[in-house]
Design a protein with these regions (language model features):
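A glycine- and small-aliphatic-rich helix-loop capping segment at beta-alpha/alpha-beta transitions
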Residues: 26-35, 55-66, 143-153, 169-173, ...
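C-terminal non-catalytic interaction/assembly regions of soluble proteins
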Residues: 267-398
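Glycine-rich nucleotide/cofactor/substrate-binding loop typically near the N-terminus or early
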Residues: 32, 37-123
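Accessory alpha-helical/coil subdomains and C-terminal extensions
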Residues: 108-113, 119-122, 128-133, 141-143, ...
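Short, acidic/small-residue loops that bind anionic groups at enzyme active sites
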Residues: 36, 42-43, 145-168, 222-229
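N-terminal phosphate-binding or glycine-rich loops at protein starts, especially the Walker A/P-loop
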Residues: 2-56
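Short beta-strand elements at the ligand-binding edges of bilobed clamshell
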Residues: 164-173, 318-321
Length: 398
């Protein structure tokens, strides 16, 4: 006779994909199954649970999948998310995005479908929800927690800017890829004796530029937390090139970096469901300005640039070692909390130790680089000293 389930846990992934999501899904599923829990994977993030059709039996739902040790065993070897994802915000759904089955009930220009989300979770028999995502996904998890849904969150974003944790799934692979590609591009920059300008993702925080720069990926780096003077940058880049036997220099540019007195650069004016515009293009502008100004510091001779936007390359492919190990620990820690009956918590790393914090932390402040401690505002590069006693993830502690 089959054992009675201790309860049903649902897992979903929201926001951008990163390597490391699948190891977290796998770890939580296996731990849950081995302890008598039933696990449901909710496909396509908040969009999927929003589209549940309560007129159909659970086994016929397009956006649900029963997760077992058998069907998650191999997923940790792959990047992205096995459950797929979306950037949907259920509390702010445009009329044209309301599921067809709900058209009669929700026909305003902007609709809050939170009541439907809660009813759908109840329909599926979900007793615990594990959302894996960044501050947007987790802030909506907080909304559900306040409405009575038992939730335990797992932080994920290559930007590493979720408040309350030193580390978010996807960050290490992003840093690893950035360092690898920057070193590979050096062969081109050196062969042609050029400036190498590399733009990286990161939105409003500069961790994805600063940490690779600390590891030697570039001579200089530009971050959103501190405006830069293009004239000063040009002078430094020319000097770096002159001091390099191969006659080239490298700058990492966070997509949110800003010229002095200007605003962030957006690739277009469209916004996602959370109101975010798509950043991008600052690397192009820096490249152009460096070429214009370089002769002034190079005895009148021009210096050409190689301009490379990393974009999705740093969030694609298999996870690195850290993004295989930390997600495994996060998935297990989430299950620890569930088995202890705790809710409204986000698992985290604090000062190098696994821990958990209240969900509310996600919305209380913005996580940024501590410029005074870790950034040289005169030389546009990482600044650090006396690492004794600091956590493993230097510069990202929160």
């Amino acid at each position: 006779m089959p054992k009675k389930s201790k309860g049903t846990i649902a897992i979903l992934t929201g926001g951008g994909d990163v390597p490391g999501l699948n190891p977290a899904i796998r770890a939580a599923t296996i731990r849950a199954n081995r302890n008598g829990y039933r696990v449901v994977g909710l496909r396509n993030g908040w969009e999927g649970i929003m589209k549940i059709d309560r007129t159909k039996p659970v086994e016929d739902q397009q956006y649900c999948q029963i997760l077992t040790e058998g069907n998650v065993q191999k997923i940790a070897r792959t990047g992205g998310t096995f459950l797929h994802t979306s950037r949907t915000k259920p509390s702010k759904v445009a009329k044209e995005k309301v599921p067809e089955i709900l058209h009669d009930k929700y026909n305003a220009d902007e609709n809050d479908l939170t009541d439907e989300i809660i009813k759908n979770l109840e329909f599926l028999g979900i007793e615990y929800l594990v959302p894996i995502g960044g501050d947007d996904t987790l802030s909506y998890g907080l909304r559900l927690h306040k409405a009575g849904v038992r939730c335990v969150g797992i932080p994920k974003t290559m930007d590493n800017d979720v408040p309350g944790t030193d580390y978010c799934i996807g960050f290490s692979t992003c840093v690893t890829r950035t360092i690898e590609y920057a070193h590979q591009l050096r062969t081109c920059a050196g062969s042609h004796e050029r400036f190498l300008v590399i733009e990286v993702m990161g939105r409003y925080a500069g961790f994805t530029a600063l940490v690779p720069a600390m590891a030697g990926a570039s001579d200089r780096c530009l971050i959103p937390e501190h405006e830069f003077d293009i004239e000063r940058l040009t002078e430094l880049m020319v000097k770096d090139r002159r001091d390099n036997e191969s006659n080239y220099s490298v700058v990492l540019v966070s997509e949110g970096a800003m010229f002095g007195g200007s605003e962030m650069t957006f690739s277009n004016q469209e916004t996602d469901d959370y109101g975010h515009k798509k950043l991008g293009g600052i690397g192009d502008m820096v490249s152009a300005e460096l070429m214009v100004r370089a002769p002034k510091y190079n005895k009148g001779e021009p210096i050409h640039t190689i301009n490379q936007r990393m974009s999705y390359m740093t969030r694609s492919g298999q996870p690195d070692a850290i993004d295989s190990i930390v997600p495994m620990a996060y998935g297990n820690l989430a299950m620890d909390l569930i088995m202890e009956g705790k809710s409204g918590r986000m698992v985290c790393l604090k000062n190098g130790r696994y821990d958990h914090v209240p969900f509310e932390v996600v919305t209380e402040y913005e996580k940024k680089i501590d410029v005074e401690r870790f950034y040289d505002t005169e030389r546009y590069r990482p600044h650090y000293h006396n690492c004794m006693g600091m956590p493993q993830f230097i510069m990202t502690s929160d």
